[in-house]
């Protein structure tokens, strides 16, 4: 008898918890709730993507649905008043009552999208969910800068750059269609070379080029959306002709010496001295000084007589 009495007391003590649980479940059922099958979709440019927004619980048969786009700190409408808005108009439709499907996505569609549902007949009338869309862009043809010729033992830098791909591409270099390792020391095949490849910046740096480094080089830029390569370009590694350089310098010095000697000889012979007029030079009078000059036929010379000016 005492045992059954204790059991009844325990049941009575648990009744409030039971009623609270029922009340809580009732409130949950009467509150609108959303979920998404993929809150971080990733898609390649020019493909289609679905932005999933699913109502799991609601007592409202016709809730109000809105979609907004958040990009660079600005919020704009995507779906409002049962119409697609903004730059997504014409390539977006609504499916499953609350989800969006975007056709022919572009890189400008990368943003955070917010699905908002207003259910006026529910205790909790509003719920929202955010979805981050990432659009990956295939790289375009990279720009490669490759020196045409480099002397043996000198440093050389090959550059590869691409600016359109997203996420940022990684770079790899090829010589005669053979991929180059990041570090030449890591592969015995390139033991005669001394280079390093930076896959982030696209540079290929030779510390000291060797004859075996001659060949055709090209670069490939790649990311998750695809890859692109530049046209192959030849790089020649040549030996320095020391004897030829010395001979050329000697020839220049000899030519300069011959020219100098020729100038000196010409100067000694008076080729650079201006000839003077024969006889005595005279200076023409600058102004009339009051003296008349009379030439006599007997003397054949100039004589003067004084004249007085009154």
Swiss-Prot record:
Q: Which GO terms describe its cellular component?
A: bicellular tight junction; cell surface; cell-cell contact zone; cell-cell junction; desmosome; extracellular space; filamentous actin; Golgi apparatus
Question: Where, per UniProt, does this protein localize?
Answer: Cell membrane; Cell junction; Cell junction, Desmosome; Cell junction, Tight junction
GO MF, one annotated term: protein heterodimerization activity
Give start-end ranges for the coiled-coil region(s).
none
Q: Which residues form the signal peptide?
A: 1-29
- Outcome, altering residue 66 to R: Decreased binding to JAM2
Phenotype seen when the gene is deleted: Important mortality during the postnatal period; about 40% of the mutant mice survive. Mutant males are infertile; they have strongly reduced testis size and fail to produce mature sperm cells. Developing spermatids fail to become polarized, and do not form acrosomes.
Membrane-spanning ranges: 242-262
Disulphide bridges, residue numbers = 53-115, 160-219
Q: Which InterPro entries match?
A: Ig-like_dom, Ig-like_dom_sf, Ig-like_fold, Ig_sub, Ig_sub2, Ig_V-set, JAM-C
Which protein family is it in?
Belongs to the immunoglobulin superfamily.
Q: Provide the assembly information.
A: Interacts with ITGAM. Interacts with GORASP2.
Instruction: Spell out the protein name for this chain.
Output: Junctional adhesion molecule C
- What broad taxonomic lineage does this protein's source fall under? Eukaryota, Metazoa, Chordata, Craniata, Vertebrata
């Amino acid at each position: 008898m005492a045992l059954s009495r204790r059991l009844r007391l325990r049941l009575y003590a648990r009744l409030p918890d039971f009623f609270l649980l029922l009340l809580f479940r009732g409130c949950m059922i009467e509150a609108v709730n959303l979920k998404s099958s993929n809150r971080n979709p990733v898609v390649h440019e020019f493909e289609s993507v679905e932005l999933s927004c699913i109502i799991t619980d609601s007592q409202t048969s016709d809730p109000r649905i809105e979609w907004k786009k958040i990009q660079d700190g600005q919020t704009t409408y995507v779906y409002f008043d049962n119409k697609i808005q903004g730059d997504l108009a014409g390539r977006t439709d609504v499916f499953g009552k609350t989800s969006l499907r975007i056709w022919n996505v572009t890189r400008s569609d990368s943003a955070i999208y917010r699905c908002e549902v207003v259910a006026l007949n529910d205790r909790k009338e509003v719920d929202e969910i955010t979805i981050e869309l990432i659009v990956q862009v295939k790289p375009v043809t990279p720009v490669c800068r490759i020196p045409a010729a480099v002397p043996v033992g000198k440093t050389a830098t090959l550059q590869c750059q691409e600016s359109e791909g997203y996420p940022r591409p990684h770079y790899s270099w090829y010589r005669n269609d053979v991929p180059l390792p990041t570090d030449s020391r890591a592969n015995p095949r390139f033991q005669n070379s001394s280079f390093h490849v930076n896959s982030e910046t696209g540079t290929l740096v030779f510390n000291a080029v060797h004859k075996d480094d001659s060949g055709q080089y090209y670069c490939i830029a790649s990311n998750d959306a695809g890859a692109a390569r530049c046209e192959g370009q030849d790089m020649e590694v040549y030996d320095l002709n020391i004897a030829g350089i010395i001979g050329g310098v000697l020839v220049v010095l000899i030519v300069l010496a011959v020219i100098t000697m020729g100038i000196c000889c010409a100067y000694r012979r008076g080729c650079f001295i201006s000839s003077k007029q024969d006889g005595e030079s005279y200076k023409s009078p600058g102004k009339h000084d009051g003296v008349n000059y009379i030439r006599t036929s007997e003397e054949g010379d100039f004589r003067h007589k004084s004249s007085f000016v009154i």
